[in-house]
Regions:
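Polyanion-binding surfaces on beta-sheet-dominated domains and ring/shell assemblies
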Residues: 13-237
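Short, Lys/Arg-enriched N-terminal segments with co-localized hydrophobic residues
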Residues: 1-16
Length: 237
């Protein structure tokens, strides 16, 4: 084969390889298509459905409220896809409260912190003497179960409502395109009514910081956690 034909064949082969790569990329639609558009893409929807079915078959790596429920797993898959996270990791951070799916505060905090809505990390200002809310105590309670009454030991707070007065956290972050920190309003511990997590007893500063981040995000970047609620918020609804 003459040199000219060889060059022509090489260029033609390069185009075929290039086209093949394009097709391969298009076949990986779920990796590049947005979650909101996935339901309108037949190929992407089929792959997501197959993954949701596989996820629902799991008995160990997904919580009991998702096992055997492909439709619910599909919602988790699409939410994880929107956040760019592992669906199994997201599933482990969910809870069923009053028939509504709730996401753990830790997950919601991570989603907001890793989003493109803010630059860098969140900043926190604590006010008041938080040393007043570091004491805990153990109590025993009688509960009724299927096999009758039984006694449980619980750790509860060792401080009073008066000790919480004046304690607050203020959350702030640098919004995308800005250079200064945008601070939210102070969130007072005495104003937090629903406290489902035991961490409100052992680590109230962390829990109120999580709550402050959610309040800040709902005000300044609501699109990041639209339709996502923590168990504490679900119980209030």
């Amino acid at each position: 084969m003459c040199a000219a034909l060889k060059r022509c064949a090489y260029r033609h082969k390069g185009k075929i390889m290039e086209n093949t790569n394009i097709v391969t990329t298009e076949q990986q639609a779920p990796n590049t298509i947005s979650a909101s558009n996935a339901i309108f893409n037949v190929q992407a929807l089929g792959q997501l459905t197959a993954f949701a079915n596989l996820m629902a078959d799991s008995q160990v790596t997904v919580p009991a409220h998702l096992a055997g429920k492909p439709a619910d797993c599909m919602a988790i898959v699409m939410q994880a896809m929107q956040w760019g996270m592992n669906p199994y990791a997201v599933a482990q951070k969910t809870h069923l409260v009053n028939g509504v799916l709730g996401y753990e505060a830790q997950l919601v905090n991570a989603v907001i912190a890793s989003s493109s809505a803010i630059h860098g990390r969140f900043h926190y200002r604590y006010g008041g003497d938080w040393e007043r809310c570091t004491r805990t105590q153990e109590i025993t309670r009688d509960k009724n179960g299927k096999n009758g009454k039984y006694t449980v030991t619980e750790r509860v707070r060792g401080w009073t409502d008066e000790d919480e007065i004046g304690l607050f956290v203020q959350v702030g972050a640098i919004l995308r395109g800005e250079s200064e920190i945008t601070w939210g309003e102070p969130l007072y511990l005495s104003g937090v009514v629903t406290r489902n997590s035991p961490l409100w007893v052992s680590n109230p500063k962390q829990q109120i910081a999580y709550l402050g981040v959610k309040y800040w995000a709902r005000l300044y970047c609501p699109e990041v956690i639209l339709g996502v609620y923590s168990p504490d918020e679900v119980e209030q609804r």
